[in-house]
Amino acid sequence: PGSGLAALAHELAFRHIVLNDPNIGGRYSALSHFGLLPAALTGVDLTDLLGRTSTAIQSMRPAVELGAFMGDGANQGRDKLTLLLSPPLAPVGAWIEQLIAESTGKEGQGILPIDMEPALEAADYSGDRLFVYLRMDDTLDERVASLVSAGQPLLQISLDELHDLGTAFYYWEFATALAGHLMGIHPFDQPDVEAAKVLARDM
């Protein structure tokens, strides 16, 4: 609301004008108009996606467990988070990476998310790692089992199908905010990002 694009849309009588809440940070906007409108235009059944999300989040335990896993782990020196994603979910890794890095990477600390890392032997990882397995098929089960057997800290979140991504988005957003709180970090501001935008505009 109030942007030049919104003014232009009204001036030219666009067929539909969708205004998003300006208080929602971009990285937390997957379930806002910013994320849902493009999804609808590509054929995603939003009724199914949001219905499944609404049902699943009646229990926030998985999100709380994920947030505590990340926040407590970081406080204990395990501040590298390796993402293990079933192949159909691989594109989600880039969003998770941005969400966690921008939300927690400030004040001289943070969680470093690692996406698309080549597989190492379970014993080759140092003691600063956490692993989260976002599972939708069994492709990575053997690798995950070897990590667990080696004593690596790993949390698994299982999805039945792609329309459960709404649930995953919600869980990750909540968990990231909780992790930031546990680390004593404000998870919603982005001082360095805003400073960079100001510098870019002044160039």
Task: Describe the predicted segments one by one.
Residues 134-158:
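Phosphate/diphosphate-binding loops
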Residues 87-88, 155-163:
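Phosphate-binding beta-loop-alpha motif at adenosine-nucleotide cofactor sites
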Residues 1-132, 137, 167, 171-203:
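Active-site phosphate/pyrophosphate-binding segments
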